[in-house]
Amino acid sequence: MHNNNVGDDGAKAVAEALKVNPVLTELSLHGNNIGDDGAKAIAEALKVNPVLTKLDLDYNNLGDAGKQAVRDAVKDRSGFVLYTSG
């Protein structure tokens, strides 16, 4: 889902889907104009989704609060790959 401009509302919808998704292991939301609100929604979803192992949030509009929320959500998940730069 690279560069689709989903924004915070789209990220919130993706987060709801992640909460009940038993198969998706990698997700790229690279360059989608996602801000802190969207990142926080994704972070909440990651807390209940043990299947996802890689998440690319590079080149969005994440502030420190959004980045930290996602990092905190996966901090105890060994091997989780997270990209939040750009």
Predicted regions: what they are:
Residues 1-86:
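Leucine-rich tandem repeat or coiled-coil scaffolds
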